[in-house]
UniProtKB/Swiss-Prot annotation:
Probable heterotrimer consisting of an alpha chain and two beta chains. The alpha chain can probably have different glycosylation states. Thermostable. Retains hemagglutinating activity after incubation at 60 degrees Celsius for 1 hour. At higher temperatures activity drops drastically. GO terms for molecular function: carbohydrate binding. The lineage of its organism: Eukaryota, Metazoa, Porifera, Demospongiae, Heteroscleromorpha. Keywords: Glycoprotein, Lectin. This is Halilectin 3, alpha chain. Glycans are attached at residue 73. Lectin with affinity for N-acetyl-galactosamine, carragenan and glycoprotein porcine stomach mucin (PSM). Has metal-independent hemagglutinating activity towards erythrocytes from rabbit and human. Hemagglutinating activity is not inhibited by D-galactose, D-glucose, D-mannose, D-fucose, methyl-alpha-D-galactopyranoside, methyl-alpha-D-glucopyranoside, N-acetyl-glucosamine, N-acetyl-mannosamine, D-fructose, alpha-D-lactose, beta-D-lactose, D-lactulose, D-sucrose, fucoidan or glycoproteins thyroglobulin and ovalmucoid. Disulfide bonds: none annotated. It comes from the Eukaryota. Glycosylated. Optimum pH is 6-7 for hemagglutinating activity. Activity drops rapidly at lower or higher pH.
Length: 145
């Protein structure tokens, strides 16, 4: 793996578990979600499977082709997210392995931070030798308002 994998986008399609931690003033959100991403179909589906803060569990399907967010029934703005490392993120190297360091059991991860109006921490699994694509593992965001 490169010293600093700087992936800008995820592969065309992927699915997995995404951990989201968000802190805003006195509100704390921690959810575990089953997620799927499809750039060809322009869809992102996130199904909350567990909430540590008694948030109601829900499924949200963002259809960027039709510009509709199902579940919340609102119009989508912008483009389909690339889920890559944000441009202004700082690499907190080195790349490391989570779990067992035995072939097929551990996962290689790279950590990045952003310190703007709070603190954001992102963990990605870089793919391939170049590290130009990645899959998000965790997003942790603390916002100071």
């Amino acid at each position: 793996q490169p010293e600093e994998p700087r992936c800008r986008e995820t592969p065309e399609t992927w699915s997995g578990v995404l951990y989201i931690i968000s802190v805003r003033n006195t509100e704390v959100l921690f959810t575990i979600s089953s997620s799927s991403y499809d750039r060809t179909e322009q869809k992102i589906k996130i199904t909350m499977v567990k909430s540590m803060t008694n948030q109601p569990l829900k499924t949200v399907l963002d259809d960027y082709e039709k510009r509709i967010r199902y579940c919340k029934n609102e119009t989508l703005e912008g483009e389909l997210p690339s889920f890559g490392v944000p441009e202004n993120a700082h690499f907190d190297g080195p790349v490391e392995t989570l779990g067992a360091k035995i072939a097929g059991l551990g996962v290689t991860v790279a950590h990045y931070t952003i310190a703007e109006r709070g603190f954001s921490y992102f963990t990605y699994h870089p793919l391939g030798d170049e590290g130009t694509q990645c899959i998000p593992i965790t997003n942790s965001i603390a916002t100071l308002d």
